[in-house]
Every structure is written in C-alpha cells, then in structure tokens.
Amino acid sequence: MSATHKMRYNLQLVLPSNTRARWAWLLLLLSNPAAVLAKCASDYFVHSLPGQPEGSVLKMHAGHIEIDSEHKGNLFFWHYQNRHIANRQRTVIWLNGGPGCSSMDGALMEVGPYRLKDDHSLVYNEGSWDEFANLLFVDQPVGTGFSYVSTDSYVHELGPMADQFIIFLDRWFKLFPEYENDDIYLAGESYAGQYIPYIAKAIVKRNEKLPANQTAWNVEGLIIGNGWIAPNEQYRSYLTYAYKEGILKESSEGAQAAEAQLSQCSSKLSEVGKFGIHIDECERVMELILDTTKINGKCLNMYDIRLDDTSDSCGMNWPPDISSVTTYLRRPDVVKALNINEDKTTGWRECSPGVGRNLRATESVPSIQLLPGLLEGGIPVLLFSGDKDLICNHVGTEDLIQNMKWSRGTGFELSPGVRAPRHDWVFEGLPAGVYQQARNLTYVKFYNASHMVPFDFPRRSRDMLDRFLGVDITTIGGDPADSRIDGLKGTITSVGAHPNSTTAEEREKEKMKIAAWQAYYKSGEIALIVVAIAATIWGFFVWRSKRREQGGEYQGIYPNLESLSSSSLSTFRSKRRGRHDIESTSRSDEAELESLYNGPEISEVLETQDGRQRELSADGSNEKASASLMVERNLR
C-alpha cells in the first residue's frame, strides 16, 4: 500500500449473524488486510510528472499490482492512453529484456511519449508509439526495475514468468476494464524475444479454457526488436557478423581463439538439445571477440559497433541517456508521482543482477520453438533488427528465420524454391532499411541502427509500428510522412511531430471551444438564477417589513425569530449568491470541458496526496557492469 498516495477503499462487508462467527470472520480479515483494502483505478492516476513539458497533460496511470501475496511479489506498470484513435482501439504492451532489465528503458529512452533532456527535464518524443495505441510498460519478472519480491522468490524458468504475467494482466484489466477488448500487441526487444512468445502462448491457453462469462484477450501481433530468440543460430552468428563488419580478421590470433571457443559452444548446443537459452561456453565467444578490441582502456560497444566504451564495460554504460534516467527515477518527487509502494525500499536500477542470476531457464525451451505454432495459429509476428548491433545481430535473426519451419514452408518461402523478395524502404528520401514478408511473418532491417532501434530512429520505428498495426489515418485526416517501400507509399500513416497535425485534432480543438462556451454559458445562467432568487427573497422581506410597519401582518408567537437584522440578511445573501457557490457551479459545469481530456478521471485530478516519503537507497551504481562480463551480460 502506497504511503505517498491517498487511496480510496472498497469496503463491501457482509457480517455473519452469529456472534462467534462474526468474531472469527473479523479475525480472518485482520490477518489478511488485502481482503478488505482494494485499490481502484483512481489510486493509480498520475496527476503530473516533475519536469514535464508544457502542453496538454497525457493521461497516465502507474503503480504496483500484487501477483504473489505470499512472497510480496509486485509488478510495476506505467500506462499511457493513446493520443488519437485511428480505425480501432489498440494496446501495445512493451517489455525490455535482460533478463531483469527495466521497461523504463523503453518508456524514457525508446517508444514512450517522453525523453529526458537532462536529469530533471522531460521533452516530447516525436516518434512515440502512443500516437494511435495505448502503451503499457511493465517491469517484469518480479524484482525488475520498480517491481519487487522477497529475495529468495525470483523466477527461474520462463513458464512461471508467463504465468505471473497472466495474473498481472487479469488484475490490471479488472482495474481498467475499458481496455480489455482492445487489439493487444506484445512488443519488446532483446531477451524479451523469450518473454513475448511465452506470454503469447500463455494467453492463447487462457483463452482456450476461458469460462463463457469472461473476456478473451485479442492478441493481434507480436513485435520483437533485436530479439534473443534462437540461441543455436544466434550464438553461431557472433563470428560471422564480426568477420562481416571487420571487427575480427579471419586467421588472426584472436579469430583462432574465438573459433576454438565456438567449437566448444557448438558441442554444448548439441548436448543440451532442445534446451539451452543461456550457454556459458557460447557466451565466452562474445567475450573473446570483445577482448580483441580492447586498446588503451577502451573496447567495442557490443550494442552499437560504431561506438566504444571503457574496457571493463564494452557497452554496458550505453545508451548515454541512462545516467539521466537513473537520476530522474530515483528522485523522491518522481517516486511519489508514479505511486511507488513504500515496500519498494531500494532505488530504481536499470538491470537487476538478482533476476538475471536466477532466471537461467535451464528447463525452458528457446522461444524459437514456440513461434511456428503462434504463426500458424493466426498471430502475425514482426521481427526487426538494427544492423549495427553485435549482441543480437541481424545475421542471427535472418538465419533463424531461414531455418524456421511453419505453415508448410521453410523461412521466407512463397513456394518450393521461391523466396519472398526484399523490398527497399525509403523514409523521407533516405534509405531506411529493407522489408521482407511471408506467411504471417514480417522482417525489417534498419540501416545504421543499434541494439535499441527506437532510440536511434523513433519516427521510423513508429512508421514500422503503424504499418504493422494497420493504422489508417485517411478517415481522420493529416499529413503523413513520406515513407515508401519499393517506391510505393501504401497505407497512409502519420509519423509527424507532436502535436499531430490532423483534422481530428482540429475537430477536438473546436469541441473544446464549444464546450468552454457552453460551460461559461451554463455558469452565467445559474448565476442569474441565483441572483433572481436572492432578489425575490429580498423583495419578500422588504414587503413583510412594510406590512409590519402598517400593522397589517400577523405576528408569530416567537417574534424574535422574525427580527432579522440587516447584517444577518447580508450574510444570508452572501451565502445564497456569493462567489463561492458560483465558482462551485462553474467547476461542475466545466467538468464537461475537462472530460474531453480526462474522461472519467476528472474527479481524480482534485484528489490530494498525503503520507510520508520513504528515502530510496543511495546505492546508485550501475548494476550491469560486473567483473565477469560473460555472466552479467545483459540482453536489454
């Protein structure tokens, strides 16, 4: 329960009639406070963010949802409502990888509506994915980012991870039922290439066993960027990519050492068979490649080969925004704004080593074995890769696609011996990448992009998203960006800067003006009515006073009650027609105006916050860096 956010409770108690039973029942409730203290949606409302830019405030909710009461397991979420609705309602759920890396990376450095100008100022992200879709960022599994759990209760396999996520979604939709019928897209990057297919499969199973009175969740697509999906192909791609990009010279001493290690890796991959997502012998291949690049205290950045980093990190200090993000998310006013539970006693960290050490998934099959069934079940999948990433490089992604069998074909076969062509993608006159598609699977390679594509190219990434989601803005107007595949524009999507210049927004502004005039007009009407009533009452008392003077009025048996002084009458007038009541009426009427942005949350904006603020841990170290790069390497 948050100490920094005033909560409302739903108390629905039915007491047994028997006295002894009532006491037993009460003791049971006291032993389980959650049985009577339930949060509602307004408890998660984010009133504002410190340092947010000027302009319309985005509608946000954030906070913790308990998924495991026995071990205090809580997942943190941050939700943004979409800015516009194109042709249907959609929700994109974003997950970062690791395992154990926070989805606040995605929220504040990639696809969220804000980015940090510095450690205290937010600016709009011109390529935010919330333009035509609701965005839900979740720190998962338990122990990741703002999420927390008892230290001995981390998840160890991908199946339990997915089960916990189903519990989270079920409870989240109970809080926010208005989104349960949305088209749902599971999106993320890196190790989320394991999370996403497992969660999708768990949702499919849930829908199959669903009682008739519950809502099926409509998973309409999976989106995985630079994903860790198929260790067999992707571990082997390290050397291939290193040779291709000139990182390592064939037959060099370093190359020979890496080749020898790759042989051990291949043997281990054969030994583990269908299992094996994290193989230490294969991780060593990457370490040897990076060792060859260490010069003068620097080494290659494995997430963006165009950059270097300190020799003990090799990319773990990247991207450059991470320092500002860490400082911002540890600020007490930000912690309060995001409704962080007081049970979360340590400060936010990008990646949790405890989660990474425990989620080794030794008994879980790689997600590549789940993708064919999902594709054949009718769920479209989009895989995209930045071509300057080494750790989850595009060569490995292309190899896993080429070897994957689904829907009576292998890879991008259109028919036996015929492969789907690659299409050139040009964005605003510049080569952006290539598209390839067949049998429900789409692949996009981004030119000159790193491990975190939306960090480098936010607007291009949203153009890709809008195409995949089937966003069509022809019905609402607007000026789309010039995005062409093989010279053709295709479906019209909008990826312009915020605020989006659409006719829908112009109509919304016009509605705001009309609502404002109506609110003020109603307030004026009510004020006139109040004045008229007050004038009538005043006239009545004047008339009675004259009657008394003329002796024509009957005197009551309690004459003192009739002797209103001029001062008391003045007080009476001020209460009936004073500024206080007129402003109260105005606020009520102007709710119509504010509801255009806030909808049902208008009452929440007026809530106050109380309680104390617990100080976060001062431990500000970047937990990703470690002495053993092989063990603590993160697939973010």
Curated annotation (Swiss-Prot):
Compositionally skewed regions (Basic and acidic residues) per UniProt: 580-590
UniProt entry tagged with the keyword Hydrolase: yes
Q: How does it sit in the membrane?
A: Single-pass type I membrane protein
- Residues annotated as the enzyme's active site: 190, 389, 451
Q: Which residues form the signal peptide?
A: 1-38
Q: Which GO terms describe its biological process?
A: apoptotic process; proteolysis
Superkingdom per UniProt? Eukaryota
According to its UniProt record, this protein's enzyme class is hydrolase
Localization, per the record, is: Golgi apparatus, trans-Golgi network membrane
Keyword Membrane carried by entry: yes
Show which residues sit on the Lumenal side of the membrane: 39-522
Q: Which GO terms describe its molecular function?
A: serine-type carboxypeptidase activity
The record's Gene Ontology cellular component field reads:
membrane; trans-Golgi network
Segments in the Cytoplasmic topological domain: 544-636
The record ties this protein, via InterPro entries, to:
AB_hydrolase_fold (IPR029058), Peptidase_S10 (IPR001563), Ser_caboxypep_ser_AS (IPR018202)
Q: Which reaction does it catalyse?
A: Preferential release of a C-terminal arginine or lysine residue
Recorded hits in PROSITE patterns, A to Z, give: CARBOXYPEPT_SER_SER
Arranged from A to Z, the UniProt key words for this protein are: Apoptosis, Carboxypeptidase, Glycoprotein, Golgi apparatus, Hydrolase, Membrane, Protease, Signal, Transmembrane, Transmembrane helix
TM regions (residue ranges): 523-543
Family that this chain belongs to: Belongs to the peptidase S10 family.
Protein's UniProt name: Pheromone-processing carboxypeptidase KEX1
